[in-house]
Amino acid sequence: MKKGNKTVWNECIDILDNVKSPSFSANFDDYFKKSKSKPPKKNKKVLNNIKKAELKLKKKANKKQKANTLYIPPFAQQAKGIVITINKMWKNVHNDDSKQEISILSDVSLQIAYGEIVIILGSSGSGKTTLLNLIGGYDSISLGSCIVANCPLEKCTSEQLLTYRKNNLGYVYQRYNLIELLSAYDNIAISQNLIPKYQRRLDIEELAEKLDIKEILYKFPYEMSGGQKQRVAIARAIIKEPKLLLCDEPTGALDSNSAENIINLLQTINKTYKQTILMVTHDVSLTRIANRIIKISDGKIVSNQLVRPLV
């Protein structure tokens, strides 16, 4: 695969984070056949290479497991109405200079209810993104426990964490992470294809209308403004109706007007779909939409306030 094609494939890996799961390939063929956008002809070879690379991963995964084996995460019972339960969680890393372990997250304990908007505040290097990555199953827990949607993350294998993310999470990045060779519609559809048809309740065009992106649905990322790209990224994240929407500085790359629109949009999504939202930011102005505000400093939670209880 040429360098340019490899870059596109890596984008798919970063965004979907499920490509090593055999289930991803199931609808890949149908997806491109039914695609409503028509990328330039020169991109067809690139898309075919993406498909071929995915099929190779599928074959490799199948050799390592028995037929029809599912990587089902372990189960832990949480209190009713609670989506996240963290108890004395630590994240340690090895310091090459001192040859000792240092703690970048220390003794974290908290509970978050379904439907809350949680704003996690902290300066750069405070540990707020580390906390988000641990909740998302993107990093390993050193000590303690983290249960999300009845799944104890510290007990999961890497394959089980893939299943956990596919079934429970949507992720919104600061830099959008849209696949440049796909239209807005296809960027959203490729996420929807990760779930079986019988589980799909949201229609892409109806969702696009609610998120005010219907007019750009068949445009490519290079034709969009920053605010439009972030709206598409949010649509991609919520199309599969995740239990938890993780947002890492979602307004950090936007101008003030676009940022305000995204903030209002996230609040609307929370009210319309009862979506639980965890948002990492250094922007204090975002706290106006929060149910809960968590402040982190030097890897520790210094404040955890429920400022607006759920009705």
Swiss-Prot record:
Alphabetized GO MF terms: ATP binding; ATP hydrolysis activity
Binding site residues for ATP: G122, S123, S124, G125, S126, G127, K128, T129
Coiled-coil zones: none
Pfam families: ABC_tran
Domain of life the protein comes from: Bacteria
Domain ABC transporter: 84-310
Keywords: ATP-binding, Nucleotide-binding, Transport
Cited InterPro entries: AAA+_ATPase, ABC_transporter-like_ATP-bd, ABC_transporter-like_CS, MacB-like_ATP-bd, P-loop_NTPase
Keyword Transport found: yes
Keyword Zinc: no
SMART domains: AAA (SM00382)
Family of the protein in this entry: Belongs to the ABC transporter superfamily.
Protein name: Putative ABC transporter ATP-binding protein MG467
